[in-house]
C-alpha cells in the first residue's frame, strides 16, 4: 500500500477520535486553463489529398474539439462553497508498502473502529512482473483517482453535517483512498462517499466527497500487461504484418448488408474485409487499417491471417496486407485506456517489461465529424513532426497537431493541437501549446489520442517504427 495512503488513514483516525475538524486552510485551486481551450475551439483534421465526395464522407480522418465545455461551472453544494481547492494533478506515487490485502485489512479495521462501514479500498499496484523506470515523469497522478463531474465540498466526515475543509471544481482530479457508507442523500438516492487525500504544504490531508458527484478512474495496469502477453504470443511465431488501407488507397471494402459498420463496432472506411472463406461471396467483417495480423498462408489472391485480439481466422485480399513494414521486434508498446482516459507506456529492457511512462490522455467520441478511438492491437505505422487538419466541413486548414505517431487510418497519438491565427489573410503559427485542461477528462477528439505536448514529443523520439505497437483497451 502506498505510504501516502497509510499516513492519510492514521491522520483520519486521529481526527475522528478527537471529533474535531483538521486545522486546515481552504485549498485554493490552481485553475489555470489553456488559453486556446478557453478562447477557441480546437479543430483537428488531417489534410486529405483525395477530396472526392466519397472520400469526404467515408474517411473521417478528423480531429476537432466538440461544442461542449469541460470546465462548466455547476452550483456548489452549499452557498458558502465558493473557494476552490489546490490542483492535485501532479501528486506522485512513489512509496509502496505492503499489498492489497494488507491495505484492506488496515483500513477496514480503522474505519470500523470509528463506526464507518468500508465498501471498497482503492490500492492499484504495478504487477509484480513489471518493473518501473520512468523516462518521462511530468504530470504524475495517483493510480486511483476521482474525476469530478460537478463542483463538490470536501468534508471532514462522510456526512453533510461535517465541517467543509475544502472544495474541488468540475473536471478536476483527486487521489482516491476508499469508498465508505455515510449520509444517505435522498435527492441522489445514495449513501456512498469517497475518501480522498492530498498533500498541502508538506502535510497529508484527507476528507470525503459524496460519490454521485465524481467518477472513479484507475490505471488498469493488470489489463495492460495482459494485452502485452496477447501480443507477445502472436509475435512469438515471427514478424507481424498489418492491414494497409490508409485513405482507402487499396479500395474501400463492400458494405455488410447495406451497412458501413460491422457488428463488432468497426467501420468500412479504411478497413479490409476479413472473409471466413477465400472468396468474396463469403461472410466477412471489417479489419481496420493498421491492425496487426499473423500471416498463416496464401491462396488464390487471399492471405489467411490471425488478427491479434480477434477470435478465429480470416481471409483478406493480398493487396490489404503490408508485410514489408512489419512489426519485426516487439520492444515497445503504447497502451491507451479508452474507459479511464489514461495510458501506460512499456519498454522491454534487458528482457523485462518496464513501465517507463504513465499519464492522462483523451480519446475520440462519436459525432457528426468524429469517431471513437477503435479498440485493438495496431502497428505504430509512421511518425510525423506535425500534421495539418481541416476545419470541420471545409477544406480550410485550421491548424496542426505536433509530434504525431499514426496507428490506424487518420488516427494518431499527438500533442496539443494548435489553431493557426489569421492576420492579413495569412496563417500565423502562434507556437506549440504544452497543456490542455481537458486532457484525461472525457472523450472529445475525432479518433486521435491527445497527449500533453511534451509527452507526445517524448513518444515521438522514443518510438521505433518496426518495434513499437499501439494498443487500445477499455
List each language-model region with its residue ranges.
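Residue-level "contact hotspot" at macromolecular interaction interfaces
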Residues: 166-167, 286, 360, 372, ...
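SH3/SH3-like beta-barrel superfamily modules
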Residues: 108-110, 115-117, 168-212, 285-319
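Gly/Pro-biased beta-strand-loop elements
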Residues: 318-428
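Sec-dependent N-terminal signal peptides of Gram-positive bacterial secreted proteins and lipoproteins
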Residues: 3-24
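SH3-family beta-barrel domains
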Residues: 23-54, 63-71, 96-153, 166-170, ...
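Short, structured beta-strand/loop micro-motifs enriched in basic residues and often containing a Trp
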Residues: 150-159, 270-278, 446-453
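Exported/periplasmic cell-wall-interacting domains
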Residues: 24-35, 46, 50, 105-109, ...
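SH3/SH3-like (including bacterial SH3b) beta-barrel domains
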Residues: 157-173, 276-289
Amino acid at each position: 500500500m502506498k505510504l501516502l495512503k497509510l499516513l492519510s488513514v492514521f491522520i483520519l483516525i486521529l481526527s475522528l477520535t478527537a471529533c474535531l475538524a483538521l486545522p486546515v486552510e481552504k485549498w485554493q485551486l490552481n485553475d489555470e486553463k489553456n488559453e486556446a481551450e478557453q478562447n477557441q475551439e480546437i479543430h483537428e483534421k488531417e489534410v486529405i489529398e483525395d477530396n472526392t465526395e466519397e472520400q469526404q464522407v467515408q474517411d473521417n480522418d478528423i480531429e476537432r474539439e466538440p461544442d461542449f465545455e469541460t470546465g462548466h461551472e455547476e452550483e456548489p453544494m452549499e452557498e458558502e462553497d465558493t473557494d476552490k481547492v489546490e490542483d492535485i494533478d501532479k501528486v506522485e506515487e512513489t512509496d509502496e508498502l505492503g499489498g492489497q490485502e494488507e491495505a484492506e485489512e488496515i483500513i477496514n479495521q480503522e474505519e470500523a473502529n470509528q463506526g464507518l462501514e468500508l465498501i471498497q479500498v482503492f490500492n492499484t499496484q504495478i504487477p509484480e512482473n513489471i518493473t518501473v523506470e520512468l523516462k518521462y515523469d511530468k504530470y504524475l497522478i495517483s493510480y486511483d483517482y476521482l474525476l469530478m463531474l460537478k463542483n463538490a465540498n470536501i468534508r471532514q466526515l462522510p456526512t453533510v453535517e461535517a465541517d467543509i475543509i475544502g472544495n474541488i471544481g468540475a473536471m478536476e482530479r483527486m487521489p482516491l483512498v476508499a469508498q465508505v457508507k455515510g449520509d444517505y442523500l435522498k435527492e441522489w438516492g445514495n449513501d456512498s462517499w469517497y475518501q480522498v487525500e492530498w498533500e498541502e504544504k508538506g502535510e497529508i490531508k484527507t476528507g470525503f466527497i459524496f460519490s454521485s458527484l465524481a467518477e472513479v478512474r484507475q490505471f488498469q495496469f493488470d489489463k495492460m500487461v495482459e494485452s502485452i502477453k496477447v501480443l507477445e504470443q502472436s509475435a512469438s511465431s515471427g514478424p507481424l504484418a498489418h492491414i494497409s488501407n490508409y485513405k482507402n488507397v487499396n479500395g474501400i471494402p463492400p458494405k455488410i448488408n447495406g451497412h458501413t459498420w460491422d457488428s463488432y463496432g468497426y467501420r468500412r472506411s479504411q478497413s479490409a474485409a476479413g472473409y471466413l472463406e477465400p472468396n468474396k461471396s463469403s461472410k466477412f467483417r471489417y479489419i481496420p487499417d493498421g491492425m496487426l495480423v499473423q500471416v498463416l498462408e496464401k491462396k488464390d489472391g487471399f492471405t489467411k491471417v490471425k488478427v491479434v485480439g480477434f477470435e478465429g481466422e480470416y481471409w483478406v485480399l493480398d493487396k490489404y496486407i503490408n508485410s514489408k513494414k512489419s512489426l519485426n521486434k516487439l520492444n515497445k508498446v503504447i497502451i491507451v485506456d479508452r474507459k479511464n482516459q489514461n495510458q501506460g507506456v512499456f519498454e522491454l529492457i534487458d528482457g523485462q517489461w518496464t513501465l517507463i511512462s504513465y499519464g492522462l490522455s483523451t480519446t475520440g467520441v462519436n459525432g457528426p465529424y468524429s469517431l471513437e478511438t477503435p479498440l485493438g492491437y495496431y502497428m505504430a505505422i509512421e511518425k510525423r513532426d506535425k500534421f495539418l487538419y481541416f476545419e470541420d466541413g471545409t477544406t480550410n486548414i485550421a491548424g496542426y497537431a505536433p509530434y504525431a505517431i499514426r496507428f490506424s487510418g487518420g488516427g494518431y497519438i499527438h500533442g496539443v493541437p494548435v489553431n493557426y491565427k489569421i492576420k492579413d489573410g495569412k496563417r500565423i503559427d502562434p507556437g506549440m501549446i504544452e497543456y490542455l485542461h481537458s486532457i484525461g477528462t472525457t472523450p472529445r477528439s475525432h479518433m486521435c489520442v491527445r497527449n500533453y505536448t511534451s509527452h507526445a514529443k517524448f513518444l515521438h523520439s522514443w518510438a521505433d517504427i518496426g518495434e513499437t505497437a499501439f494498443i487500445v483497451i477499455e
